[in-house]
């Protein structure tokens, strides 16, 4: 039986970039829908028909941040990569805080774009085969498959990227995991690429606010000085 091709939505207002991305992704075996307007992009993004969204930040109608925000209110599973000429810390934090899995700064390497798209989709499949639950200190239980959990009586929800981080740390709970390892194994970045590690720190900070009783004094997702992060699970 032939496996269905992953379906990607490209929302990019510059026609040359949009057409180039479409041709590139089709060449690499993906099905692609492409639009150049933020309002049309939001409508298609909310259809639930795509495995991954490539969103430009600066768009007519609705910008990429707004699309990401609206999608994450109803869909925590679809992968989202932001395409942006904005690379300041505030812009990066904003996109990731709204639930984007990754961001790629323009101008970008074609090879790196394809690698990141494939890595995001590959991790999605790996997550589906992960352990069912993770238990942490503070009466925290995490349901990996449903991207949800609870801390005491409080319900928790996670983005797919957040759960991928937790799942990878849980599989390697006996040791600290470095930022570089997370970027390579979870994000799928090339080891030779110069990557801003603040991406990892932003996601870890978000996770701590969800799973820790006191995010400033973490008991479960701890920092090992000079080595990285470690997840301490409960029996």
Give names to the regions the model predicted:
Residues 189-198:
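Short, positively charged loop/turn segments that connect secondary-structure elements
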Residues 165-166, 182, 200, 207, ...:
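DNA major-groove recognition helices of helix-turn-helix
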């Amino acid at each position: 039986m032939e496996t269905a091709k992953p379906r990607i939505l490209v929302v990019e207002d510059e026609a040359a970039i949009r057409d180039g991305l479409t041709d590139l992704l089709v060449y690499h075996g993906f099905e692609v829908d492409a639009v150049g307007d933020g309002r049309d992009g939001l409508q298609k993004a909310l259809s639930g028909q795509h495995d991954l969204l490539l969103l430009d930040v600066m768009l007519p109608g609705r910008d990429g941040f707004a699309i990401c925000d609206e999608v994450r209110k109803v869909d925590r599973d679809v992968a989202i990569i932001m395409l942006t000429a904005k690379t300041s810390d505030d812009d990066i934090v904003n996109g990731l805080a709204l639930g984007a899995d990754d961001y790629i700064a323009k101008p970008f390497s074609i090879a790196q774009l394809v690698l990141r798209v494939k890595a995001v989709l590959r991790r999605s499949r790996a997550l589906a085969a992960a352990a069912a639950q993770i238990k942490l200190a503070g009466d925290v239980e995490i349901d990996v498959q449903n991207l949800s959990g609870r801390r005491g009586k409080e319900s928790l929800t996670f983005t797919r990227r957040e759960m991928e981080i937790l799942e990878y740390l849980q599989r390697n709970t006996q040791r600290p995991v470095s930022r570089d390892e997370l970027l390579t194994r979870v994000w799928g970045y090339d080891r030779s690429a110069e990557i801003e590690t603040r991406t990892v720190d932003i996601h870890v900070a978000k996770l701590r606010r969800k799973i820790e009783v006191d995010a400033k004094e973490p008991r479960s997702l701890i920092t090992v000085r000079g080595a990285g992060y470690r997840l301490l699970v409960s029996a």
